[in-house]
Amino acid sequence: MYVQPESGFERHMLVWLEEDGWRAVQGLARQEHKPALKLWEGQDWPAVVRRMDIDARDDEVCLGLPLPPDENSGEKVRVSIRAHVGHISRAAPAVDLRAALRSSGPWRERLAALERDAAGMGLRVYGSLAMQALTGLLYVSQNSDVDVLFHPTSRKQLDDGMEVLSRHAAQLPLDGEIVFPGGQAVSWKEWRMAIAHPAKVIVKELRSVRLADTASLLATLEDA
């Protein structure tokens, strides 16, 4: 039986549902979403943890199924679902950057260079690149970003990581978030601007979105 991690769920985590979970989700789904849900269940692909709905219960987790862009219109559909924690078979962090390299197409060499320079940083990816790596379906286009997740534990690691991301952003369409302890996520580009020109930043958490000053977030990191 799945046991929820002590640290709780975090946005962009991956969640696999048991058969009963898919059955419950299908029972509440809109008709146009049912084929995608059936495909996800049949392939045993994970759903992605998203911010909790305001009326979600404590024993639920809110999830998303980002579908591939429409071949003709390019429209992106994200199927929003909820699952009971008891219907989860397993959960995992977002996709490791190294694991996504094989699915990165024209970015592969440049992403491999980022992965080498970011050794020890534990970079992960979400969004189009992650979904393409997980499913084998076509998500990445010439307009896609590379959404990275960076979980620093110390101020030095944060500074080093920001230097690496800023340098490689000249060669890659890098986007994504710094995730401070407790799942407090900030756009790494917004953080860079706020450090250069002091300002509050938007912090995204599992249950809320708020403004915070950079000092309060830095205080959650180790000094070394």
State what each model feature region is.
Residues 138-141, 164, 191:
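Short, glycine/charged-enriched secondary-structure capping and boundary segments
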Residues 78-86, 191, 196-219:
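Mature, function-bearing regions of proteins
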Residues 64, 151-152, 179:
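Conserved beta-strand segments of the P-loop GTPase G domain that flank and frequently precede/overlap
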Residues 221-224:
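Extended catalytic-interface subdomain
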